[in-house]
Amino acid sequence: IDYPAFRESVRDFLHEALTPELRRAGELTTSVFSDFDAALAWQKKLHAQGWIAPDWPKEFGGPGWDIQQRAIFQEECKLANAPSVVMMGIQMLGPMLMHYGTEDQKHHYLPRMLSGEHIWCQGYSEPGAGSDLASLKTSAIRDGSDYLVTGTKIWTSMAQHANQIFCLVRTDKSVKPQAGISFLLIELDSPGTVSYTH
């Protein structure tokens, strides 16, 4: 791989693709989250270029870059003041689905994650169960091919924008607290789901 040439191709793309508004959103990013509208607009441009998920292999829609290409891309994005992307799905859920998901789940969720059609939030913390996830109380009871989920999640980053949530729930109360926890993917427009922003 000609890394200097790759760096130039990244710079050229960033020069063309980053509007003044997107650069300004990047400048104003103070943590890992950029302005949502800017992040989604930037995600769509990177998706069209095939660069939205630098760590993902080609078989799942990533560019298949090696570690040096990923480092160059990240460095050039920072130097150009690119905003972040909508990352909860791509960086947190995507790699887990690639490894543990069924073929149907991979086929359904991964492309929508990359395109920005699905915006994900994380449903781990609860009142009384912040970093101590073994204390979580949200329950999920099997109902045919579905689950009936009852409980509350808090500190749910991106919930105000999300249409999907990956969620830890208790499915077995007969075992020790660290066991009996399952990982569910839930559509936030499911009946009975309510989201509050403070």
Provide a role label for each language-model segment.
Residues 59, 125-129, 154-155:
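Short, solvent-exposed loop/turn elements at beta->coil junctions and helix N-caps
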Residues 146, 150-193:
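A short core secondary-structure module
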Residues 1-87, 98, 104-115, 119:
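Amphipathic, small/basic residue-rich leader segments at the start of a protein or domain
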Residues 92-100:
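Helix-loop "lid/cap" segments that line or gate small-molecule binding pockets
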Residues 138-140:
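A structural signal for short hydrophobic beta-strand segments in well-ordered beta-sheet cores
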Residues 128-136:
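Active-site-adjacent elements of ketosynthase-type condensing enzymes
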Residues 197-198:
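Conserved small/polar residues in nucleotide/adenosyl-binding loops
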